[in-house]
């Protein structure tokens, strides 16, 4: 069972949740809590579907905890911050995925093959 945390439950977060709920090997370990930090340690990987301006800080926090991350686009507003996040992912030996298009389609999602 792959324990999954979802940060952000707006329009896109709901689409991701609904699509990913169809994967039988996946279990959501989050709640509608205002503080996502409450469940970070319970998750194997984190999906981030928050407003764009929050991506950098939340992704960085998750990577520093050794979590695999799937972030909605854009990852960051600039190359410097994006490079920093990928360097952290490399240092902690975790995966950092960034959504491009149609990430709510279950056939195109990396977790389907446990490729994280």
Regions found by a protein language model. Name each.
Residues 26-28, 69, 96:
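Hydrophobic/aromatic residues located in beta-strands of well-ordered beta-sheets
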Residues 1-37:
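N-terminal Rossmann-like dinucleotide-binding module
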Residues 76-116:
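A contiguous active-site-proximal alpha/beta segment in oxidoreductase catalytic domains
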Residues 34-86:
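Beta-loop-alpha module in the N-terminal Rossmann-like domain of NAD(P)-dependent dehydrogenases
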Residues 13, 55-56, 107-108:
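Short, well-ordered alpha-helical microsegments
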Residues 26, 43-46, 116:
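Local beta-strand N-terminus motif with an aromatic residue
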């Amino acid at each position: 069972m792959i324990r999954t945390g979802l940060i952000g439950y707006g329009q896109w977060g709901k689409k991701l949740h609904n699509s990913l709920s169809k994967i039988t090997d996946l279990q959501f370990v989050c709640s509608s809590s205002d503080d996502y930090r409450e469940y970070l340690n319970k998750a194997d990987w984190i999906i981030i579907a928050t407003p764009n301006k929050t991506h950098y800080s939340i992704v960085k926090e998750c990577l520093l905890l050794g979590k695999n991350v799937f972030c909605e686009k854009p990852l960051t507003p600039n190359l410097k911050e994006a490079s920093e996040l990928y360097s952290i992912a490399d240092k902690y030996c975790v995966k950092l995925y960034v959504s491009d298009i149609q990430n709510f389609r279950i056939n195109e999602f990396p977790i389907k093959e446990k490729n994280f």
